[in-house]
Amino acid sequence: MLPRAARPPCLRVPGHFAHRGPAVPRSTPRISTRHSIQFRVFSTSKGLLNKNATSEPKTPISGSPLAPQSADQKTKNAQNAAGTPKRDLLSETMVGKQEQRKADWAIMKEMAKYLWPKDDWGTKLRVGTALSLLVGAKILNVNVPFYFKSIVDSMNVDFAAIGGTAYTVAGSMIIAYGVTRIGATLFQELRNAVFASVAQKAIRRVARNVFEHLLRLDLNFHLSRQTGGLTRAIDRGTKGISFLLTSMVFHVVPTALEISLVCGILTYQYGAQFAAITAATMVAYSAFTITTTAWRTKFRKQANAADNRGATVAVDSLINYEAVKYFNNEKFEVARYDKALKAYEDASIKVTTSLAFLNSGQNMIFSSALAGMMYLAANGVASGSLTVGDLVMVNQLVFQLSVPLNFLGSVYRELRQSLLDMETLFNLQKVNVNITEKPNAKPLQLHRGGEIKFENVTFGYHPDRPILKNASFTIPAGQKFAIVGPSGCGKSTILRLLFRYYDVQEGRILVDGQDVRDVTLESLRKAIGVVPQDTPLFNDSIAHNIRYGRIDATDEEVRKAAQRAHIHELIEKLPEGYKTAVGERGMMISGGEKQRLAISRLILKDPELLFFDEATSALDTYTEQALLQNINSVLKDKARTSVFVAHRLRTICDSDQILVLKEGRVAETGSHRELLELDGIYAELWNAQEMSFAQDPESEGNAELEEGAGQEVLPDSRQK
């Protein structure tokens, strides 16, 4: 333990706990003040990099959308800041028939662009070839009944009398029949092969556009998202694209073509009666299918909504697996999931039973028409006006219509389902991006070294609870700046506003004299590096998560960044080293290890403006001090503007300036010594934390060790 005289100057201020007094028994209650002080427990970092580790889950930050305010300007700013309330895109809201029809046509027109894209002659050639093959297949199919008729009529002779065989009598017709059927099948399969790339390319483009749009949406959308339902809706929508494109090209128009050909043949060969029955059958069949399918749509929507809810519950429970276990709530989560499954079960039963009704009605209409036409043909055979071959041909032609008709029925059903699925997908693309660039936005120019200025800034996530209230302060370029205050006073919100996750409702934010709303988002965010409270990690390797700070970084640069973040040696001890996977959201490593990986990212990105939001809260004292030493050396060597948000005041007492927030307003500013001499809120927070160390002998020991380490950590330029 170092003598008190050897401690850093910020820990040796006379009159402010220079004498701590005797240790207070452990049972003595902790001090509590009106400023809602958060006490942090110093603990040893554990996790994947420590064999005796347990993961440390963190609670995600939640937000709520900002409702419109009374004044017009405030309304506009509020909407830009946090978005106006919208209906849940994943809840299949019932709409009127006219609105649904408009939405369906809009989707059809949008998808037509992928079928016949401008300046893409390759796609146009494939679509044209596929259509040609389709027409060829339909023509061959229509010829099959003619060959069948010829075969039957040729065979309707006395073979013994003419001394012939099946081959000599009908051989050529049999061969033509087989070749025609083979040709029709071959054309259909070639059509599918040629069109496959068109459908897959469209799926890829739509899915990429939706994903790109989701990444452009503001933070408010993603804080209120339902991950499981969202991914399920995207999956269903992309699958629906292929079916919709195939239906548009290969089912709807071709079926109409085939029906027209059959009606024309029946009229020409056998008279208007046969064609009239065929046409009436088509009208009745189509009308019944469309009407019944429209009635069934609501059951499909209910099933989709229940499916989304079930996926959301399942993903949410599995992601928060540890929380479920901590509170023994497995039965509760199973009950939640089962409730969603029950809703899906009920809706699916309605879908299935209504489908049975639809199929029965379709078969009844078709079978009635077939029986009527066979009766007319049989009368013709009996009267001698038709041959047995004609009877067979009529039967074949009508049965040949059954295939496209059945397709038409199922296609319409699935087409409606695909349109419903794609409606959600395309609605995601219609979500407004609230945080946008001005048309004349220019790249951020840091010609003053990165001075940050907040001028009369007012902002709140909810109109009834503003976070920042007319806040004004300046963060000088190249200095270490700290922001402290009770929880909920707006410390982390400052970063969100600077990063333009939200826009201010009043006032403005300047970086080197440039309003952040006047510069490009890419240049602004490229200049800012962040170590957040809850470090986001991908379910990938350690190397990938570090390299995410700069995607084009080499392996050597990744290692150097890890070394400066004091995590390289721990990584090297792992069997797979930098290839070790960190698990979903980094759950396989501890909070301290997450923070060091986040700092590695920041070092690799090397931005001009650095934000540390409780960046070392999960580290043990030794690691924290060694890491702060490296961070301070970087700040000193490169003169970076840095902002530290902290509850543990010992980690920021060497800052050039400290800003104290209270209830969204700037309460105090100054150096550590100046604020203690002011004897205001900061002094009260400091004294309360010092008393907490005095009351806990273990914390006292850690504090002494921290102070001793701090003697080496703080650069001379920071000691005041």
UniProtKB/Swiss-Prot annotation:
Membrane topology: Multi-pass membrane protein
Domain ABC transporter stretches: 452-688
Protein's name according to its UniProt entry: Iron-sulfur clusters transporter atm1, mitochondrial
Keyword Lyase on entry: no
Mitochondrial intermembrane topological domain residue ranges: 149-171, 269, 376-390
A GO MF label: ATP binding
Cell compartment(s), UniProt: Mitochondrion inner membrane
UniProt cross-references to SMART domains, sorted A to Z: AAA
Alphabetical UniProt keywords: ATP-binding, Membrane, Mitochondrion, Mitochondrion inner membrane, Nucleotide-binding, Transit peptide, Translocase, Transmembrane, Transmembrane helix, Transport
Binding-site positions, glutathione: 296-300, 359-362, 409
Organism: Aspergillus oryzae (strain ATCC 42149 / RIB 40) (Yellow koji mold)
Family that this chain belongs to: Belongs to the ABC transporter superfamily. ABCB family. Heavy Metal importer (TC 3.A.1.210) subfamily.
Transit peptide, from-to: 1-49
Gene of this entry: atm1
Residues that hold ATP according to the record: 461, 485-496
Comp. bias regions, Acidic residues: 697-709
Subunit structure comment from the entry: Homodimer.
UniProt topological domain (Mitochondrial matrix) ranges: 50-126, 196-244, 291-356, 413-720
